[in-house]
Amino acid sequence: MRVYPLILIATTLLAWGAAFAQVSAVVQKPTVEVHAQPRLDAPKVTTLTRGASVSISAQQGLWYQVQIAAGATGFVRVNDVRVSYAGAEGEEANVRALFDGKSGEGRVTETAGVRGIDESELKLAALDQTQLNAMIGNRVDAAAGAAYAAERGLQATSVAYAAETKGASAAEPTEATAAKPRPAKSAGALLGSLGRELGSMLGDKAGPTATTAADTAAKVIPKSDAEVAAEELALGPEIAGRVLGARPLWNDAEAQRRVNRIGRWVASQTSRPDLPWAFGIIDTPEVNAYAAPGGFVLVARGLYDLLSSDSEVAAVLGHEISHCVQSDHYNVIRKQELASYGKELALKDVDATTGSVAGDHARRYAEQYGAAVMLTALDREAEYRSDEAAEIYLARSGMNPLALYAVLQKMMSLGVESASLAQLQKTHPPLDSRMDRIDRRGYAALEPYTARD
């Protein structure tokens, strides 16, 4: 188990008007207008061209205050420049980080032995039912999410998203039934549709036996949308409860309420608003987040502390919400099951009369693998798609899609060797690659929403 040396994150986390330790950045666009105030209609100070170097001294909303030639200052939007990757983490890199977030109360954050949750911990961690009950107890309904939006003047906006999956639906469970891990209705259905997927997963290594197992499972064990929904709802608490067994919820009731209200509002703008969405902040200084099947989303305290606004919180949650909407980790579990059990176990568990699979699949899966699936790297396209979805969800939620870019910039400034980013870097594309993809894609139909406060 790797233990990192003492890392001092000493920052003055600032309200408007104070100054950041400067962060180097480079102009990304052919031309960028520098404004006198953080408004698009503010007077123009100058125009910068691609490759020009600037120093960021502060962030206000989704604008950076920058220093340009001869000591002049002005404002550019967060996607006009690209923060330079810090070469290595240390006191200097951390001081330079854009920490104007939740911890921006004039306090100094000192983290000793920063160590992210690793795969072995998640595999071995026991389900913490008390913590799981607490997370579920913090859950709010769609009406509470809408009330949050009304308080802040946010209005739902219709924004098309062709890549969004219309997931399987399921009735929202009661608090009592949701608090207890539930068995899947048809565990074998987990294997049922994998014949067409096995080749891409195992390639030539699978061999004829594995392919036959997949084909047989696909023919013998049908799977309906209702079965998929039941399996996701059963797996979610089992996996989230084990993440909470590795790291408990952060003891900050207001922060937990905040992420649930924001998260529920954003989730209501997706194609799966009826999932029993539950959000939580776990007490670990790392910068990461997790999405378990069935609408369970956990954010590490280290990431939450970076976020300076509700829109930045929504950006992080939106990325994870997309993984739930698209069933990304559920699909990983399906592949693991097929690769692990194969033809013999699949057929052994099939009832010849009904074609269903006996046993508590969700618990059996969790007992074998724990919550290690949370640190399984998804296909890069799935991560890029979740970034795009987060921008869509921000726009639909009445917020500014640029908030995601601001979050990625903050993480970028932590450095390529950041201990706090170690696990995230193992499971996600490089941060600069993610921003490159956003830049190439552009905002197109989302452009009008990038002018929002």
Feature annotation, model-predicted:
Residues 22-41:
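Short N-terminal segments immediately surrounding and downstream of signal-peptide cleavage
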Residues 16-21:
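Sec/Tat signal peptide C-region and signal peptidase I cleavage site
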Residues 6-15:
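Bacterial N-terminal signal peptides
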Residues 36-50, 56-59:
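SH3/SH3-like (including bacterial SH3b) beta-barrel domains
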Residues 1-5:
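Positively charged n-region of N-terminal signal peptides that target proteins for export
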Residues 29, 43, 55, 59, ...:
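Boundary regions of SH3-family modules and the immediately adjacent low-complexity/disordered segments
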Residues 124-453:
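A Zn2+-metalloprotease active-site environment signal
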